[in-house]
Structure formats: structure tokens, C-alpha cells
């Protein structure tokens, strides 16, 4: 009876049974020579590293709710970009997020071309835009998620963006699911690369707009240890925005991570297929006692150009994974585990 009480106490305090051992104590007749090997995970343990400073646990994110306006040159565009980078970095932010297709005003230069040719003209700026962002990341000591822009590769056109780290390195991410309009009007192809990114303060993922509406993508990144998911988006109407926003909140709950979204506002009367935009950028959290009850950490004013700065506490995620009211990550069955379910037959 005493041993049963001890085991009950241990299991109620998050010890986990790793295996049952036989012939552990041959002389212990009461236990029939059985023993349980238990494990307790110390979520606060930090392994020794060669880093001089400890890893950050509170990360500051900055969002740009971008106003679409006419820019005649790439220099005009980056005058506005640098203004926002300067402003957000002034608040000691670790990240700044720009929206999807923030550089669309430059397509006005190609108004004499068809929509599919105009977007390819815009793709001609992508390498220079990436390089300029990288210089800003270094100069202002901030990690930049560049939203998204078109990229031509091997005869196909993709919707991509870049993580420009403040240490001078960069990596690319791709939009996996392109919208029907992107396919019809611009001839875009869906990408195939999905990964998480290590940074100096968090492991992050990026999903471009429509991709956040497919839970499998963020689930893969959550399995890779993603702590913050960034979602640059471009939506024209409030119902389109609601799809992105509601799905973003769902991703925060089911993957026990922070989700940061940023979009564009205003209109571009001189750019085909980019008439109007609607956005309300925000930072979303899981829903548990340590987080806002509605899962909204911070939100921008709808349809107004502004920046939004918010802190997110990574330690809260670690505690949630183990001690949360519910534990979506630990309790989620892998896809193969659902093969036993009885599904209705179709005739």
C-alpha cells in the first residue's frame, strides 16, 4: 500500500513511467520483484553553452501595418521602410515584421503590361530589396521578416520572403499554397520549402497569408520546436482578413506558440489587381491562465497605418507545455494514431 501511495504521488507531480523493470529487487516479495523507472522533466533546466549571455526569455516583436501609397522608385520605398525599421528598433525590438506584397506599389511602373507581366517586372526588384533589408538588419540591430515579394526561378514565379538576421545572415521562406487569384491573375506557383529558423532569441516559423489556413504546416514547425509564428498577409476585404486572423488564433492554441500577423491598409488605384486592402495586425497567444483570456496579446487599430510593439514571454510556453490546463502538443495524437477510427463509408 505504501509503495502504491508513493507512485500515485509521483504520477500526480508529472513523473512519467518510462518502463516497468523485472527482477529489480529479487528479495522484495511484496512488489513481486517489479519496479517502475520514472522520469521527471525539469523545464527550467538550461544546459551549459559557450554563449557569454544567457538566452533571452522575453522577446520583443514589432509589426508594421503598412499603408499602400504610390512610390515612384525603390529609393522612395526604402525611405519609408527605413523609417519603420528605425522606429521599431528604437523600442529595442528583436523582430520587425512587414506584410505580404508590401512592395506592390512599384508595379505601377509596369501598368502598360498585363498583370502577369507586371508582377514579373516587380520580381526584378527582389534581389535588391533583400540586400537592402539585410543592411538595415545589421545597421539597426534587428531581425527583419521581410513580408513577401515575387521571385522568378527556373521559369516559375513564387511568393517568397526573407528572414534577415542582425548578424548579417539570411534565409528564404516560400508560400506553399497560393490563392486562386494569385494563380489566375499572376500565374504564381506554390513553393515546396517549409522549415523553422533559429535566431538569437527564439526559434521561429513564417507562413505567408493563405498558408496559415492549413494547420498541417504549422504543426510540422511546432514539432520542430517553433516558439513564434510570423504571418505576413495581404487581404482586400474584412471577411478575407477574418479567415487569416481566426486561423492564426487557432494555430496559437493548437501549437502552444505565439502568432504574430501583419497586413497592409489603403488602396492602390494605379496598380492592377491591388485595388484595396484591409488589415488589423496583432499578436496572439494560447488561451490559459498565464495568457490573455481571449488569446489576444496586442492588436492594432483596424485599417490605420501604425506600428505595434509587444513583448512575448517564452518561459510561459515552456510552463504551458507541461503544466497547462490542457496540453495540445502532448495530447495530440500523430496522424497514424487515427487509423483505428471508424469513418463513414461513401457510396
Name each model feature, range by range:
Residues 1-5, 339-345:
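Conserved small/polar residues in nucleotide/adenosyl-binding loops
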Residues 135, 151-228, 237-250:
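Active-site catalytic loop in hydrolytic enzyme cores
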Residues 54-68:
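Short beta-strand segments enriched in small/hydrophobic residues
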Residues 207-220, 319-341:
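Cysteine/selenocysteine-centered motifs that mediate thiol-based redox chemistry or coordinate metal-sulfur cofactors
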Residues 3-57:
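Terminal substrate-recognition subdomain of acyl/acetyltransferases
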Residues 74, 78, 82-166, 171, ...:
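Cys-nucleophile CN-hydrolase/nitrilase-fold catalytic domain and related Cys-dependent amidase chemistry
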Residues 32-37, 158, 194, 276-279, ...:
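Short hydrophobic/aromatic beta-strand or adjacent loop that forms the aromatic wall/cage
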Residues 123-145, 213-305:
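CN hydrolase (nitrilase-like) catalytic-core segments centered on the catalytic cysteine
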Amino acid at each position: 500500500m505504501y509503495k502504491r501511495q508513493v507512485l500515485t504521488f509521483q504520477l500526480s507531480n508529472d513523473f512519467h513511467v518510462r518502463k516497468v523493470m523485472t527482477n529489480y529487487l529479487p528479495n522484495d516479495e511484496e512488489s513481486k520483484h517489479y519496479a517502475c523507472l520514472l522520469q521527471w522533466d525539469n523545464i527550467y533546466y538550461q544546459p551549459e553553452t559557450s554563449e557569454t549571455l544567457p538566452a533571452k526569455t522575453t522577446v520583443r516583436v514589432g509589426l508594421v501595418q503598412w499603408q499602400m501609397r504610390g512610390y515612384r522608385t525603390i529609393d522612395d520605398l526604402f525611405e519609408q521602410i527605413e523609417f519603420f525599421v528605425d522606429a521599431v528598433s528604437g523600442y529595442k525590438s528583436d523582430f520587425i515584421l512587414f506584410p505580404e506584397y508590401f512592395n506592390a506599389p512599384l508595379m505601377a511602373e509596369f501598368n502598360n503590361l498585363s498583370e502577369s507581366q507586371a508582377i514579373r517586372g516587380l520580381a526584378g526588384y527582389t534581389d535588391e530589396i533583400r540586400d537592402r533589408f539585410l543592411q538595415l538588419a545589421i545597421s539597426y540591430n534587428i531581425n527583419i521578416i521581410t513580408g513577401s515579394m515575387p521571385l522568378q526561378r527556373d521559369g516559375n514565379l513564387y511568393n517568397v520572403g526573407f528572414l534577415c538576421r542582425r548578424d548579417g545572415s539570411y534565409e528564404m521562406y516560400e508560400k506553399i499554397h497560393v490563392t486562386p487569384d494569385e494563380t489566375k491573375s499572376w500565374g504564381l506557383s506554390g513553393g515546396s520549402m517549409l522549415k523553422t529558423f533559429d535566431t538569437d532569441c527564439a526559434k521561429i516559423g513564417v507562413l505567408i497569408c493563405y498558408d496559415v489556413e492549413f494547420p498541417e504546416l504549422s504543426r510540422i514547425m511546432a514539432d520542430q520546436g517553433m516558439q513564434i509564428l510570423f504571418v505576413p498577409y495581404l487581404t482586400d476585404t474584412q471577411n478575407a482578413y477574418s479567415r487569416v486572423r481566426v486561423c492564426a488564433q487557432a494555430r496559437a492554441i493548437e501549437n502552444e506558440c505565439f502568432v504574430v500577423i501583419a497586413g497592409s491598409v489603403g488602396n492602390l488605384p494605379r496598380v492592377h489587381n491591388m485595388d484595396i486592402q484591409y488589415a488589423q495586425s496583432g499578436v496572439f497567444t494560447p488561451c490559459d491562465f498565464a495568457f490573455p483570456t481571449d488569446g489576444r496579446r496586442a492588436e492594432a487599430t483596424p485599417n490605420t497605418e501604425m506600428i505595434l510593439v509587444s513583448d512575448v514571454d517564452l518561459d510561459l510556453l515552456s510552463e504551458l507545455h507541461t503544466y497547462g490546463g490542457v496540453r495540445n502538443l502532448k495530447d495530440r495524437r500523430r496522424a497514424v494514431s487515427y487509423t483505428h477510427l471508424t469513418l463513414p463509408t461513401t457510396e
